[in-house]
Amino acid sequence: MPLANEDNLTLTVHKTPFCGCCKKWIKHAREAGIYIIEKDHQNLNAIKSEYKINPKHQSCHTSISKDGYIFEGHIHADVIKKYLENPSENSKGLSVPGMPIGSPGMEMGGRLDDYVVLTIFEDNKDEIFLHSRDIQ
């Protein structure tokens, strides 16, 4: 497991204690070198409200970087790293809405739903950051 320091990407992951797919996503992120701080909540509505995450962008867990960027849902760790290299102006993070099959933590054999990773902006508008088929 990576150690926290100034050079490592650190995410605080807000999740419910009983969500197995969130635990699988955390394992994926840790294996990619991301330091994870887990925060369990019985209800995530207060977290989603605090960070002003539009319901159309929501998923089962919310990750926050030490710089305040939001990563909502089952986003591939490499995509998070790519975004953080050059965040879009006025963006607040990325979202994979829902829980698409084949996204990290949602693996089901070889099945892979086509899904998009969205950039979400301060005004809660969004645009496509990339398609799942473009994730290497």
Indicate residue ranges for each PLM-predicted region:
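Structural microenvironment flanking redox-active thiols in thiol-disulfide oxidoreductases
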Residues: 41-53, 99-104
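Thiol/selenol-based redox catalytic cores and closely related redox-interacting motifs
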Residues: 56-136
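Local sequence-structure signature of Cys/Sec-based thiol-disulfide redox active-site neighborhoods
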Residues: 4-32
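Stable alpha-helical elements in mature extracytoplasmic
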Residues: 18, 25, 40-43, 76-80
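Short, well-ordered coil/turn elements that cap or connect secondary structure elements
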Residues: 6, 31-33, 88-89, 112
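Sec-exported extracytoplasmic/periplasmic mature domains
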Residues: 27-34, 49-53, 69, 85
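Generic structural signal for residues in well-ordered beta-strands
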Residues: 36-38
